[in-house]
Amino acid sequence: MQLRAGVHRLLFVFTVAAVVGVSSERMFWYWASAPVDHLVVAMVYAPAVAGCLWFVDRYRARGLWGLVLVAPLLGYFVEGVVTPVVYAGGPVPFFPVWFAAWHGMLGLGILLFGLRHLLLARRTAALWGLSIGLGVFWGVWSTTMWLPENVNDPELIADAGAPLTLLGPADFALYAASFTAILAGCHWLLGRIWLTEFVPSRATVWIWIALTGAAVIGWSVAIPWAAPMFVAGVALQQWGLRRHARHGRPSLLAELDGRVAAPALLPLVAIPLAAAAVYALAWELEPAEGLVRYGAMYGVIALQTVVGAVLLVRSFLSVRHVAPPPELGHDRARDVHADPRPLDAGAHRATGAGAAGARPVA
């Protein structure tokens, strides 16, 4: 039974990582992005995603502000552990804020929890609207691939193993449709393997912490501020999440349990249609290089960074006066080692019979 629960948990993490990878990698650029390669992306993202899911469950992250408090962690776990990109701007936290918006809010917030909320609530009109918005964003951002500094980037060329080529409108439409199909398939599967709680074993947690720490220390050899920046960033988010956990209500994992019928996924077809339409229009209009650079690329980065910073500040303000629920008590809520969930939590733990999977929604 424990083996079955472990496999279930791994499949859940892998599928969530595949969803997040669509935004974090496939929307970000389209080079070296064959659908079969997405398996590798999911495996690379899986440890970071597992860490975020653990934080969501442990600190009962729920609602917009709880999600915003978790969002920067995905950026730190991916771009500060797997790669050192988050430290590239020096101790100034520009990249952490931007990645909180791109990795965290776009990946975890919109593609995972946002779409799932709308799918389970059967809010078809909102789902169509969000899908169109995502498609327009994808199409606009993909025009930045045309910039010389991107298409001629030595690191990207080395990763691809060959000179980079621009996708024409037809090829881009196929590309967007392929990864939207993966996104839709993952949401259908998540409805059948969803876990209402994510509680890894103590050994798994310590292994994860050890590997994460080793990676950050490794980056610190060349980047002295890497370890202090990583520890400070994660500790700050954990502080906010600990206060957020005092609301005593179920986490997003518990709230978003349920199956998604295949026909309900139809509105997602608007994502590749809108993306392809915007990309094809830009291809025909041939906008000036400066417009693409300062409008599409720097404009999107600036907007995401500002929005990310505002949301982060607002999320910390939202937890200033959260009182601990009666069942926890003030002492337990302040105990750094205590699991902040209610004492009787665990009816749906991903161990034993509690890992039975998703609960159908009528």
Predicted regions and their residues:
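Extended, charged low-complexity segments
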Residues: 212-344, 348-362
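Membrane helical hairpin/interfacial module
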Residues: 33-87, 96
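Membrane-embedded alpha-helical segments in integral membrane proteins
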Residues: 16-30, 80-87, 139-149, 210-221, ...
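N-terminal signal-anchor module of multipass membrane proteins
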Residues: 1-58
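Alpha-helical transmembrane segments
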Residues: 9-23, 74, 131-137, 206-213, ...
